[in-house]
Structures are given as C-alpha cells and as structure tokens.
Amino acid sequence: MRGGVAVSSGAMFTGTAVFDLLLPGDSRSLKAKRSYVRPIVAALRRFEVSAAEVGALDLHGRAEIGVAVVAAEAAHVREVLDSCERLVAARPEVELLSVRRRLYGVDDD
C-alpha cells in the first residue's frame, strides 16, 4: 500500500503486428490508397487496438498497417492479434503478403 492506495504488481503484456498489404492495381494515387487503408484501420480499431498506417507511405500499391494491444494476460493479446489478422486476411480488396508479430512481457527489454 502506497499513500493509502493499494498498488498492484500485476503483469502487463504488449503485442504488436504489422500487416504488409498489396493493394489493387487501380491504387495509382495516395488518395486511392487511402480509400483502401482507412476502412481497414477503422475496422481494426473495433478490436480496441491502436491502429495506423506505419510503412510504405509513399508507395501507391503497398501499405503497412500496424496494430498494438495491451492486456494483463498474454493469451488475450494473442487472441486480439489473431482476430486482427483474420480481419485483414479476409478483406477481398487487398492481399495480405506478410505479418510480423511481437509479444512483450514486463521483463522484456
């Protein structure tokens, strides 16, 4: 107890995923690219994750979307990242080329 407030030493896990996407051939401008990326980012945010376009910013035919989630249990982080990956993979307008995932615990540097 610190200053009359109970302090928890609970665990915290952070998970990240970066989705590398191939956009359709008609994505020849940044405006067209945004028309594909924005709905995917909005759909990902329904999983209560932070989501943003994080790479390939100047490439019209590619996009990288990153997500991050924090939870008290590693299993929950994995479940949320799995759900995000399924959502992106199921989008018929883009092709999911690769996924890079990381899970960090409180003891990771």
What are these regions (language model features)?
Residues R2-G10, A51-L57:
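Short beta-strand/turn micro-motifs at beta-sheet edges
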Residues G10-T16, D58-R62:
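Short, flexible turn/loop "capping" segments at secondary-structure junctions
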Residues A51-E73:
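Short, charge-patterned binding micro-sites
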Residues F47-G55, E95-R102:
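Short beta-strand elements
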Residues K31-S50:
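Short amphipathic alpha-helix segments
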Residues G15-L21, G66-V67:
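Active-site-flanking beta-strand signature of metal-NTP-handling nucleotidyl enzymes
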